[in-house]
């Protein structure tokens, strides 16, 4: 089998996890200097520029990422059907340049900066910042503990043996 056919089989039969890893796109020069990486996985909210294809030169934010299609929908990039309906055009991530990142995901930023995200301090929720006044808990006297069972339950085997003894 030709190598091209083998490669295409690997791509189209890949698991979603592998396809997700294939959704990387090049970073702009300033982001490359900042993070020391050439490419990053595209997420919703990233700003991108289209480098190749019909929509070359268009800037926009990523509206949707489709791992099944291995491509991305961008705000403002739409086509019109003959009836007048508009639909998103999905563009492969290899044809994009990431100009700014969505920084809401702290885990992602920590990974880009080369820090271990598991060792990052977790931010406390806003509700937990104001501790409520807690009343000291009153110790309630415990009820008398029940004594341990003195006689264990009879098992079926014991019952049968007793019945046989009674019959004899």
From Swiss-Prot:
Keywords: Ribonucleoprotein, Ribosomal protein, RNA-binding, rRNA-binding. GO terms for biological process: cytoplasmic translation; ribosomal large subunit biogenesis. The keyword Secreted does not apply. One of its GO terms (molecular function) is rRNA binding. The keyword rRNA-binding applies. Pfam families: Ribosomal_L26. Signal peptide: none annotated. Residues 112-168 are annotated as: Disordered. Gene3D superfamilies: 2.30.30.30. It comes from the Archaea. SUPFAM superfamilies: Translation proteins SH3-like domain. Belongs to the universal ribosomal protein uL24 family. One of two assembly initiator proteins, it binds directly to the 5'-end of the 23S rRNA, where it nucleates assembly of the 50S subunit. This is Large ribosomal subunit protein uL24. It comes from Nitrosopumilus maritimus (strain SCM1). The lineage of its organism: Archaea, Nitrososphaerota, Nitrososphaeria, Nitrosopumilales, Nitrosopumilaceae. The gene is rpl24.
